[in-house]
Regions:
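A short glycine-rich, His/Asp/Glu-containing loop-to-beta-strand
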Residues: 20-57, 63, 112-113
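Glycine- and acidic-residue-biased ligand/ion/polar-headgroup-sensing regions
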Residues: 62-74, 79
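Structural motif
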Residues: 43, 73-75, 82, 98, ...
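Conserved GNAT-family N-acetyltransferase fold
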Residues: 47, 67, 91
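Short acidic-glycine-tyrosine-enriched beta hairpin
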Residues: 80-95
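A short, N-terminal "cap"/entry segment at the start of jelly-roll beta-barrel domains
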Residues: 1-41, 125-133
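Ligand-binding loop in jelly-roll beta-barrel domains
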Residues: 95-120
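Tight coil/turn sites that cap or link beta-strands
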Residues: 51-52, 88, 96, 106
């Protein structure tokens, strides 16, 4: 099908399109590493979770989270109950809902979506992208 719209210029393209591998990386400690991208009211965190790792149960006050399992598998613990999840599964966590995970032997890649932004991750992002003095 023929396109009638003009092609976006490089500057326009760069404002709208990002590649995960070129997004800034932050260290999440035992949770792995993450590439972060932010919209005005949401945050995308592409997380590489190491094999056989454990993400301690935690909560995000006033923040909703969606977690999409892109690759691998894990057993998520939500409010004290175990939820085995696999590639293609999506978890939804309400504000202040406790969650953690036991990652499988092959590790996992997940996409966490936060709304609003997590200030702690924004701070790590700022440190990771700021020039050292």
């Amino acid at each position: 099908m023929k396109r009638k719209e003009p092609l976006a210029g490089k500057e326009e393209f760069d404002k709208k399109v990002a590649h995960i591998d070129r997004a800034p990386t932050i260290d999440l400690g035992s949770h792995g590493t993450a590439h972060l991208l932010c919209g005005e009211k949401f945050m995308l965190s592409f997380v590489d979770m190491p094999a056989n790792s454990y993400a301690e149960p935690h909560r995000h006050k006033d923040i909703e989270q969606g977690t999409i399992i892109l690759k691998g598998d894990a057993d998520f613990v939500v409010e004290g109950k175990l939820y085995p999840v696999h590639e293609g599964d999506v978890l939804i966590f309400g504000p202040n809902e406790e969650h953690g995970a036991y990652v499988g032997p092959n590790g996992a890649k997940v996409l966490d979506v936060f709304s609003p932004h997590r200030e702690d991750l924004l701070e790590k992002l700022h440190k990771a992208t700021s020039p050292t003095e």
